[in-house]
């Protein structure tokens, strides 16, 4: 007898095959049969008229803290996700020395905008080493599966202490220690190791995250630390994946370590004319196991006056006079005509390719509104609104930021949405079998 039978569901199996109606039998936690099933089960579910699909595996999440206190991992589990991968972008909470706990929280808060107060209250720190962190995850009841990676930021903090994000060159002994910690984590069950080389990632104090400027020698040593272990993965977020030089380094790294490399690009040049995907396909044909990560719909960041970033956060007046004010005081000051005039006359001090030309960036910034649209057109952007109204684009951004109670959020897609659709992604070749993806229905 089966444990469970899901009857008469419309199955979409994830292979690209046409949907079909069938029964699914479960035994001992595994699918035992699919088709017309006449045997009984301890429990049956009538799924007629319902879609039955594989659970989603979300390969890029930041539940590293939440997974230690929330068995449901909402909202992912609400949307059909059955496995989440954490430890991305080089941020996470193990290994950790007691004195560095607040630093790792501040790092996660700055990089991923997860409230530090929630992390401080929720994490009980029943671990120091990475294997102990895995034990803590395993001992906690949960509705869905979790997997994680060893984060570069935590590794550097553990070995280098206060020098972790200010000293770009660790000693040989420190590199050896970090490589051993990576190996220890992967041997204990981590999927691999993650790092970040984007200037977008900073802690709440504005310091670049540990590993941002790590040299190729350090990266290679850490990769070699998990060579040959458990089909390990190396995940890298980078500002430079539109540059041929970066790809040569990545290919050499993959060749020497034998690891599967998965990449996330943060800048438009990597996506222009599908450059990153074409380079990945070329690398695959050369024998390199390199897989870019791609979103099935635009993903990005939300920013506003109540988040850690907005269009004017790099302006001197903001940093020197406004950043420490409470929200009501801040909105009142920003509505002062002289403050507005002063800020609009300034230039950002943020030294980042993506943020250097703020007026151009406004073509990729959209007021979220009460009914969010996550696939907006240019006309919906701040630049589109400014063009329609024949107004200065940064003045429009300023006015939208302080309208109402100053609580408006702005959506900035990342990851190849510069053409205002995902057509290039949808038609890029599949590294697995070279089949062309089918364009989505307009329905």
Descriptions of predicted regions:
Residues 1-55:
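Histidine-rich, glycine-flanked metal-binding segment
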Residues 9, 29, 49, 80, ...:
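Divalent metal-coordination and catalytic microenvironments
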Residues 53-73:
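Di-metal (Zn2+ and/or Mg2+/Mn2+) metal-binding site signature of metallo-dependent hydrolases
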Residues 69-192:
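Divalent-metal coordination cores built from histidine and acidic residues
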Residues 168, 182-185, 190-312:
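Functional cores that coordinate and move charged inorganic groups
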Residues 294-415:
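Hard-cation-handling environments
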Residues 426-433:
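Conserved small/polar residues in nucleotide/adenosyl-binding loops
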Residues 439-442:
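Hydrophobic alpha-helical segments, chiefly the membrane-spanning helices
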């Amino acid at each position: 007898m089966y444990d469970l039978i899901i009857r008469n569901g419309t199955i979409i199996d994830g292979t690209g095959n046409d949907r079909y109606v069938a029964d699914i039998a479960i035994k001992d936690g595994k699918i035992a049969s699919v088709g017309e099933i006449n045997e009984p089960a301890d429990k049956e579910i009538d799924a007629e008229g319902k879609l039955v699909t594989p659970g989603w595996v979300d390969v890029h999440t930041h539940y590293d803290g939440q997974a230690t206190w929330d068995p449901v991992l909402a909202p992912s589990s609400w949307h059909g996700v059955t496995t989440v991968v954490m430890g991305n972008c080089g941020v996470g909470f193990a290994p950790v020395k007691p004195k560095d706990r607040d630093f790792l929280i501040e790092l996660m808060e700055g990089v991923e905008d997860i409230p530090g107060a929630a992390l401080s209250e929720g994490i009980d720190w029943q671990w120091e080493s990475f294997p102990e962190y895995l034990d803590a995850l395993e001992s906690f009841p949960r509705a869905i599966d979790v997997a994680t990676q060893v984060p570069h930021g935590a590794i550097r903090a553990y070995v280098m202490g206060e020098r972790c994000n200010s000293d770009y060159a660790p000693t040989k002994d420190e590199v050896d220690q970090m490589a051993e910690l990576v190996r220890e984590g992967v041997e204990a069950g981590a999927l691999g190791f993650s790092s970040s080389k984007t200037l977008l990632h900073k802690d709440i104090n504005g310091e670049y995250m540990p590993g941002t400027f790590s040299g190729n020698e350090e990266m290679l040593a850490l990769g070699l630390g998990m060579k040959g272990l458990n089909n390990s993965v190396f995940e890298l977020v980078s500002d430079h994946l539109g540059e041929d030089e970066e790809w040569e380094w990545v290919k050499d790294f993959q060749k020497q370590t034998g690891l599967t490399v998965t990449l996330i690009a943060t800048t438009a040049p990597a996506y222009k004319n599908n450059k990153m995907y074409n380079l990945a396909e070329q690398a695959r044909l050369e024998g390199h196991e390199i897989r870019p990560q791609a979103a099935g719909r635009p993903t990005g960041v939300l920013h506003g006056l109540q988040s850690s970033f907005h269009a004017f956060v790099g302006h001197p007046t903001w940093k020197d006079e406004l950043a420490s004010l409470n929200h009501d005081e801040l909105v009142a000051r920003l509505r002062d005509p002289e403050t507005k005039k002063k800020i609009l006359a300034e230039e950002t001090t943020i030294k980042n390719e993506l943020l250097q030309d703020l007026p151009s960036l406004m073509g990729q910034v959209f007021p979220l509104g009460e009914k969010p649209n996550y696939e907006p057109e240019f006309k919906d952007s701040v630049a589109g609104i400014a063009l329609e109204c024949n107004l200065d684009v940064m003045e429009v951004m300023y006015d939208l930021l302080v309208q109402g109670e100053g609580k408006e959020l702005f959506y900035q897609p990342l990851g190849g949405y510069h053409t205002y659709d995902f057509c290039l992604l949808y038609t890029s070749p599949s590294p697995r079998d070279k089949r062309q993806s089918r364009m989505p229905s307009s329905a």
